[in-house]
């Protein structure tokens, strides 16, 4: 808790300098019962009612802490495009502007695509096959989110 956009860019710079093979970063997940959870509650990043049900089950897409961070929206965009900041020469200059835009479908797609690239490289499998499966999952996930929102509207 307490990460700033400057800290995020410093993490990117360090990863770029180290020439990492797999540029994977994950948002912090403050699991109840841990010291980081207690710190987050005591410092106003989480409320006391926070539970395991509030955590992204994969731990790669969302962090409940992002909402409370001063630079939370910027950090979310940085996290989504982190891979490209490391792997594409000069992209970090564009990224410093992109963090001022709201997160959107394109950033989400690019984030998932970077996860696929890393997954395919790490497991030495065909990227095309991984990509086809990922597109199906992504579209299914969007349909589920739209369905949940529609149900929420009907209940209101």
Locations of regions flagged by a protein language model:
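A structural motif corresponding to the C-terminal lobe/cap of the Radical SAM core domain
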Residues: 1-100
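Membrane-proximal basic amphipathic "stem/tether" segments
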Residues: 77-156
